[in-house]
Every structure is written in structure tokens, then in C-alpha cells.
Amino acid sequence: MARPRRASTMQLGLFLAALLLLTPSPAGSVAAAKGGGAKSGGGGTVIGIDLGTTYSCVGVYRNGHVEIIANDQGNRITPSWVAFTDGGERLIGEAAKNQAAANPERTIYDAKRLIGRQFSDAEVQRDMKLLPFAVVDRNGKPHVRVEVKDGDVRVFSPEEVSAMVLTRMKETAEAYLGEKVTRAVVTVPAYFNDAQRQATKDAGVIAGLTVDRIINEPTAAAIAYGIDKKGAEKNVLVFDLGGGTFDVSILAIDNGVFEVLATNGDTHLGGEDFDQRLMDHFVKVIRRKHGRDITGDARALGKLRRECERAKRALSNQHQVRVEVESLFDGVDLSEPLSRARFEELNSDLFKKTMVPVRKAMADARLSKGDIDEIVLVGGSTRIPKVQQLLKDYFGGKEPNRGVNPDEAVAYGAAVQASIISGHVDENTESMILLDVAPLTLGLETAGGVMAKLIPRNTVVPTKKTQVFTTYKDKQTTVTIQVFEGERSMTRDNRLLGRFDLAGIAPAPRGAPQIEVTFEVDANGILSVLAADKATGRSEKITISGDDRKISQEEIDRMVREAEEFAEEDRRHREQVDARNSLEAYVYNIKNTLGGKMADAMEGEEKDKVEEAVREAYEWLDGNPDAGKEEYEEKLRELEDVCNPVMSAVYQRSGGGGGGAPEDGNVDDEDDHDEL
């Protein structure tokens, strides 16, 4: 059954924002009508590119439908491989992959597993041991060192390698269209972080492309599935298992409106990992049968990798294959049987691992298994029978929809989005609205290290959220805005994205200034933060770029996992901070009272008693920064027992006036804001 669409004022605003974003300009519509393709008024055709870990694909929306463009070899998908020969020739695509076994050290692949990451990332360190080419550290980021021709050694960033693949996609489109292409929509895994998205955009720039939009791969695939679907709302789960990454997204599709309800994934899980399990297995077989360890022989490993990939593909249609490599090493041939059952056993834990993001996405979307109307399979690895069976079993025997090409669906959706962005609409796309989401919670640090969450994970983007904060100390003229990403309630457990200062605040008592902080996430998932002093109008802004959001997928998974495992710990920390803040606020209010008109109405003994209690409370707070929740609460009760009777008596003697505090000693402030 269809899930009711989330309805709220914020949702309506997001819907209208997306509508405005995607509504074509009149100029764009005219240009498109004349050319019949995805053109804008002067910008040329906009293409859609699926930049994959192992294969890439390019498409264009023309004459009412998407055309997936074949490369010069006649293939509609192109290997994301780059190589350099002895003569200095650069090879891209099939030509690079076909010579890899003979030239492993100078053949580069899996750049998508390096892009936007830190050299120190655990995944990068693991991959380095498996890759035949050299991965080196440059300013904390992984780069590829390769001999481009005899004696000429070059170092390339992952962005540069990806740009080479994008260039080939661009050239493929130009050859087909007969015109120069300068604009594109490029897809990324839904769980790519900001640094990886920014790096992908940079790769486009290097390739001579303006990347008009970064779009999530499963969302693009959902467009491919739903572009011609009319009628009642459907909840669709997109299961995207490719060569190197894995995403799960759940969308509500209703007459051209594509609303992402939840997304989850693993940016380091895919067909390459299944190949590696086969590699490890046969390396052990060779060691046992021939007494030879080939892990240091890059050429032998290259030959074995190619055969393992072929065997994996064949086992999707056959129950047994033979893995054969002539002259694997020293004239020794490899010829070993491999059954589908053995392949499934070797990868059992990885296959089961794909179900974890499914369960998490379902929970975040607040859907039951019966609420899912369609399951869409995307990515070549979804052809593996065991993966299909696990998914089918999870959904009680529900058969996946096989109506989209798993290799081409992502590029298909990107091409549709490219057409809309360019201003070209027709009866298929005129009502299409895309509402995607932010994968992680965004917020800032408030007093006590508490995370104030402004944009929760799975919030529809583009989005903007404004909240008012105040100062923590008297006469505070500067506040530091520290921006974090993560699911924990304490900022120390989340990822710092960036920080900046807002200076020039007029000196005032603690709690008086009003600092308006605005978080804005654009359609590409890029975050901007603006802080402004409402009194003076002074403001500062920061855009969280790739250099600020260096966060690995392992860290993302850790954040969410720890948030689930340590929810109780988070609750205790938050309660502790709240209890301390309550005590501090009470002490501060009493201190203010002692300096105001009410103090004149106090008798000498009363004033001395309250002043002594406040002084002792200040000293106790200074000496007990890490006290427990119960200790703070007990100290507050002790202080109230001393101060409240005095305040009440004075308040009554003054006839309820005199600007005093209410009976509990707290000032009623309708502008009660979290403190920075």
C-alpha cells in the first residue's frame, strides 16, 4: 500500500523550492523546442553521466526519450580504466582494461574508491595492498604514481584519473551528437560525503565540463523506473549494488514527483569485493598445490583478477564454471572448478551485509515490508542470484522489478535530469519534481558540547533552516560557530566540518544577544552556514567545501552505528549537561537579582545568606565540572531551599513588584535560546 506523503509547512516550502529549481525558463524551452534535445538557451546539450567504479555510461534525452550512447567499440558501458603504454600512449576504457594483465603497474582503476578520501582512511590503506599500481600520500590525500612513458613518472590525483574517464564519456557524446559538449549531470553514490561530491565536481571541471548537478545514483535509477509511471503513489525501494559502491534508497513516486524518504549504503562494497574473495581463494589454492605465493606478482594477479571477474559473471547463469589461466606464472597453468555454491560461501558475509542498509533505510522511512510496492535492481552485481534471493526472502517472497537495465538505469535518470535542468521539457518530464535528502544530520555546538541539530538526516534538499541562539557569558562580543555532522547528541562524538567566528557583538548580559544561524544545503548537498547578530546586522558566512568535510564512509557508518549502540550513553550525557545548565542558570538569575532593585528590599541577614549560598554554588561548579546529573540536581535543590524562601518573602513584601523574580527564582524569558 502507498505511504501517505509527509505533509507539513516545511515540506510544502521544500516542494516549492524544488519546483522553482526545476521549472524551465522560457528561453530554455524555446531552445529545446528548436533543437529537440537537452539544450538550454546558449549552453548547448547537457548530458547525463554515470561515473562508476568499474564502468561508466553516458546518455542524452532527445526527441522524447533517453538515448544511451555507445562508445567507439560499440559498447554502451565503458570500463573506468586508464593506462599508459611504453610509448607514452594513454588508453581509456576497453583498451586500458584489455592490456592490464601485461601492464599492471601502469593501469589505473578504482579511482572512485580513492576520490575525496584521506590517505589515512582505513579503506584506502586496505585497497593500497590490493592495487597493482602505486598509491602515494600527497598533502594527506591518496594519489596515483605511474610511469606515463619511459623514465617519465607522474603523480595523478583521483580527480584527474576520474576526469580522464569523464573526458572519454564527453568525447563519446560529442561524436554521437556532432557538437561540442560542455555541461553534464554526474551521478554519485547516495552515501557519498561532501568531500567526495566536491571532488567529483572538480573532476568534471578538469574534464572540461560544467557539472550542473550532482545527483544520487539510486534516485537517478528511480527516475528511469518511474518516468512513464502514472497513477497512484508507489513506494519504491532501489537496491543499487555496483562494482564498488552500494546504496539503498526508498522513494515515494506519485505522478512525476520523486520524493526520497530515506537512504543508506556503503561506499566500499560491490563487485570488486566479490572478485577479491575469489582472488584470495585461488591464491590459497595455488600456494597449497604449487607452493608458490603470487601475492607479490602483479602480472599473475592481473591475469587471475580478469578470470575471477569472468567466472563471477558466468555463475549468474551457470551453476559451475572452470577458472583457467594459461601460464599464470613460470609456465604453470591454472585450471580449477568453481561452483556457484562455493562462490556464495566465499562471499556469504558480504552478501548478508547488503541487507543491513535495507533494514536501516526501512526503519528511517518508517515503512513496513508490506508498504514497498516495487523493488528496483540497479548495478551489475544485482545479477548475482544469491543477492536477489536474500532480497526476495527479506520481503516475503516479493519478486524484484526487472524492467530497467541495471547497467544503464543510472545514466538514463541522469540524462532525464540533465534535460530538465537545461530547460527542455515535454509531456514526460513537464511534471517531474525531484526531492532528494541529506544523508547525515547537520548541526552546531552549543554550551556544554551539546549538538543542536538544525537539519536532521533524511531531510529533503535543497533546504534551509534558521534558529536563534544567544551568548553564554556576560559582555561576550564574539561567538564561535562550530559546524558538525553526525547522529550523536554530543559534538565530541560527531565530525567537525568547519568553524568560524562572529565578532562585533554589542556587549550585553548573558542571554541578551540574539544570534541567528542559518544552515542551507543546496541541491548538490553542499552546506553553507550564515550567522548574524540581529541587533547590529553583522554577519559571517562559511561554505563547507571538500577540504572541510573530509569524512570517510567508515566514519559515517561508525557515527550511525554508535548512535544506535550508545543511545543510552547519549541520553545520560545530555541529561548531565541539562542538569548543569539548569544549576548555572539558577545561580546566574539569583546573582542578577542581588544586583537589582530587589536587593534593596532584602534585609541584611537575608542578603548575606543568599550571597553566601551563591558564592558556594559558584565554587562548587568550578570544582565539579564533570559531576553527575543527580549531583547537579541535588545542588540545585539545596540552593533553592536557601534562596526561594528569601525571594518569596521579599517578593511579597514588595507587593509582587519591584522587578523581582518569580517564586522559583527563574526569570521568565520568552526568548529562551540555546547558548553558544
From Swiss-Prot:
This is Heat shock 70 kDa protein BIP5. InterPro entries: ATPase_NBD, BIP_NBD, Heat_shock_70_CS, HSP70_C_sf, HSP70_peptide-bd_sf, Hsp_70_fam. SUPFAM superfamilies: Actin-like ATPase domain, Heat shock protein 70kD (HSP70), C-terminal subdomain, Heat shock protein 70kD (HSP70), peptide-binding domain. A motif (Prevents secretion from ER) lies at residues 673-676. GO terms for cellular component: cytoplasm; endoplasmic reticulum chaperone complex; endoplasmic reticulum lumen; membrane; nucleus. It is found in: Endoplasmic reticulum. Belongs to the heat shock protein 70 family. The keyword Magnesium does not apply. Induction: By dithiothreitol-induced endoplasmic reticulum (ER) stress response. Induced by tunicamycin-induced ER stress response. One of its GO terms (molecular function) is protein folding chaperone. Functions as a chaperone during endoplasmic reticulum (ER) stress response.
